């Protein structure tokens, strides 16, 4: 959708005498030019450089809407689109149509955010950027991507990436790290797009209150398990550190994810990462002679870290 208004009567813009130019001929001679490029060239020749201003930026969960205003001399037009680029294109197109005084001149400007899935190549979309814009708009923390697994033969590698956004998590797989990351972001966008508009507020509230365990809440918690941790030496033989960490997580309201690392350490031991969904997120490394012992070591290190944080004043 585009709108236009005149500040004053537009002067004739299409003169064929020597020393001047024809806007129509400019468009015909350079069919590959976008409306923005054509309008800019016109502005250069007439010494009326187009000026663009963003009037509205409404980023919704389903479809964002942008409105841009362009001023060329005495003419002002606006254009709307689901991206800033598209809105500017439509504003420039509207201005060109007025300058030509011929509404039949129309540039084909595809809407990049409303594609036909059967015809739109995936590489033209940017789910990672869209998810980041969504998070910024709602005041959420930015999405975090973690490469959790890499496998398969050299000629057919497969990567697995975990994407976390507040308390939500999605997993993406692909033949490259970038593709796995994109797939994870796409899953998030698909999840949010299935939420009806009336539930947007409740979703925002749910995410906004999903910060879980913060350092402040940990230090001031009256919980039995966390206070027991403060008094523990964490050096008693045969202690089940994984179970102890699980009990504290349940009490304090955070989740634990163990990520086994395929590569052995420099001294030939198994490796593991324990990720705690605290705020900020905590990641602790562990190693051992087996996967289970590496997980136990990671849990032990996580407990030591939580103990240090909880004891701080």
Swiss-Prot record:
Organism: Bos taurus
Protein's name in the database: Interferon-inducible double-stranded RNA-dependent protein kinase activator A
Alphabetized GO MF terms: double-stranded RNA binding; siRNA binding
Keywords: Cytoplasm, Phosphoprotein, Repeat, RNA-binding, RNA-mediated gene silencing
Pfam families (alphabetical): dsrm (PF00035)
Major localization class: cytoplasm
Function statement: Activates EIF2AK2/PKR in the absence of double-stranded RNA (dsRNA), leading to phosphorylation of EIF2S1/EFI2-alpha and inhibition of translation and induction of apoptosis. Required for siRNA production by DICER1 and for subsequent siRNA-mediated post-transcriptional gene silencing. Does not seem to be required for processing of pre-miRNA to miRNA by DICER1. Promotes UBC9-p53/TP53 association and sumoylation and phosphorylation of p53/TP53 at 'Lys-386' at 'Ser-392' respectively and enhances its activity in a EIF2AK2/PKR-dependent manner.
GO biological process, one term: outer ear morphogenesis
Family named by the database record: Belongs to the PRKRA family.
